Amino acid sequence: MNKYLDQLGFHLVGYGCTTCIGNSGPLDKDIAECISKNDLTVASVLSGNRNFEGRVNPHVKANYLASPPLVVAYALAGSVLINLTSDPIGIDTDGNEVFLKDIWPNNSEIRNVVEKNVSPEMFKKQYSNALDGPKEWQKINTSTGDLYNWNSSSTYVQKPPFFDNQSNDDKEIKPIENARPLLLLGNSVTTDHISPAGAIKVDSPAGNYFMERQIRQNDFNSYGARRGNHEVMVRGTFANIRIKNQLLSNVEGGYSILEPDKKKMSVYDVAMEYAKREENVVVFAGEEYGTGSSRDWAAKGTKLLGIKAVIAESFERIHRSNLVGMGVLPVQLKSHTINDLNIQSSDLINIKLTEDLKPLQELEVIIQSNMRNIKIDCILRIDTINELQYYKADGILNFVLKNILKN
């Protein structure tokens, strides 16, 4: 079928991690400028496995997943604003309307193609040496030994700091006091908003990190490819170009506001400045916080930014568990919504914690400012005794290591 797909503009141009990670190339310059200038919401249809906004391309907000034949059909139609079951997808050379049903193969046709072209031997042959890798992979020099030989100059793999303060004792459970709101987010914030896996912008904190090390923009690669380097990943946390921090008005992207300076900066830079001042930070969010793929770096990056707690209306199950696993406190509003709280960047947040912490216990969160002092009833979303042990150990990684050292 390749020659017919080529005629339609569907060329086989390579293989690898491309469209679903945002690596399939830029839009035509004029089209991209038109989208930005007019703030258009444009759509893509893809047969990949990710449809987060801005993921396929930073200019494309709406992405729809479909089978490969439907991707071709929508491309022929040129719009997602049609009903494929009743609207024509194009006009043939004789001026007749063409419908999806006219070009859609029936089961018999599909079965005949499969029987002629697919066999068990194909899979046996391809998978028999799959773990050997191509010649290029086999030529890579590797070292052996019990301990990994960290290369301090590598921009792909760096020694992570999760065990730097490892202790055999549980951390002291004490109140979170005078915490600054780092972000105020809405509903259905995905793990891709929290820790994007796509392209790295040159003017982002991660981009600056590479530029300081003389890495060319063409060699930035993606956040997904750089997940072995915590310095890149922490700079990419909350750096999605489509995230909306409601502490700032009419601003899209990974920005926050530094208090009391009232200075707009990247989320990373604000978090690092608060860390220098030894000030705690928290995140506020609406419903379904952390929905989407179960991305470990969404919790790891949150931890490395110094975020002590995420206060939300509700949590996605796996991300909530991952936050606990990194020693970050998930706190769920009991009867309020985020909008009820009218959170401001100048507020100070206090969460009352004691040594006798229990799973799913009620917590009191106090929001303070010059104008108000309100108490909010919340629920601790550490759901089990095991999770409580992880939190007390400052995360599951430290918990596991502590038990290994004990034994």
Task: Show which residues each predicted segment covers.
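Acidic, glycine-rich flexible loop/linker segments
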Residues: 92-107, 320-390, 398
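Short helix/loop capping segments that flank catalytic or ligand/cofactor-binding pockets
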Residues: 21-23, 53-56, 74-75, 83-85, ...
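Mobile "lid/hinge" segments at catalytic clefts and subdomain interfaces of large enzymes
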Residues: 8-126, 324-325, 329, 359-360
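N-terminal leader/propeptide and maturation segments of large enzyme subunits in energy/redox metabolism
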Residues: 76-150, 226-253
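Non-catalytic terminal/interface segments that mediate subunit docking, oligomerization
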Residues: 1, 138-311
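Short hydrophobic alpha-helical runs that function as membrane-insertion/retention elements
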Residues: 12-14, 308-313, 330-333
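Conserved phosphate/anionic-ligand binding catalytic regions in large, soluble enzymes, centered on
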Residues: 15-20, 49-83, 182-200, 288-301, ...
